[in-house]
Amino acid sequence: LEMAEERIAERIDANLMNVSMEDLHDLPKSMYESKIAQIQKNTSGELIIKEYPTASAHSAHFRGLLKELAIKKSFKPDILFIDYLNICASSRYKGQSNVNSYMYIKSIAEELRGLAVEANIPIMSATQTTRSGFSNSDVGLEDTSESFGLPATADLMFALISNEELEAVNQIAVKQLKNRYNDPTMNKRFVIGIDRSKMRLMDVGEDQQTGLADS
């Protein structure tokens, strides 16, 4: 919804091939083929990327796609990523309906959660913070943009937090905001490594979690 299929595929290629986005287009054909062969040897599974125009697709479109993939390709995903919730459409409210943003975003969240239950797969998406949340190093549910109906509907929410100190050591902080499946105070905060050039996230040592966990 936000990015072209090709741009998303490039990011995934950079991650899998362990090359930077900048170097991806300059890879010699032989090296490219070698990396592809290595990936095929060491991994399994299928990934399907589908692009929709911004604010035009809703849960019924995603449901139709899942059914089409099941019939034509015998494919059922293990997880569905939607980029991102706030620029989806609602199947209950038309774009020009006289409805406020609270109800509209809440409706989208409810429809996607319903689809997840129906298809028996997790659906992961993203949202943004309010203007004050952008400069807040301790983001909370109240910093969710547009509609508090979104965190009221979600089963699991976490915030990704960055600042100059974390950027200097190539890390981002993760804070659990809501968790219906476990105690959200367990591992409430932790850091993970990030390599933005290769679109990668990775674990960091326990020694780097000091003072963050459950604080």
Which residues does each predicted region cover?
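Cytosolic-facing regulatory segments adjacent to core modules
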Residues: L1-K76, T144, P184, R189-F190
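Generic enzyme active-site microenvironment
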Residues: F81, A126, T153
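Conserved RecA-like P-loop NTPase ATPase core
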Residues: E2, I49, D83, L112, ...
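C-terminal regions of RecA-like/P-loop NTPase motor modules
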Residues: Q40-K41, A60-P77, K94-Q96, G114-A119, ...
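Hydrophobic/aromatic beta-strand patches that form the interior of the parallel beta-sheet core
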Residues: I48-K50, M124, F158
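Flexible beta-alpha connector loops of hexameric P-loop NTPases
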Residues: E22-P28, K50-S56, S90-K106, G133-E142
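Conserved H-loop
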Residues: M3, S125-Q128
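Helical hairpin unit composed of two closely spaced alpha helices linked by a short loop
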Residues: K76-I123
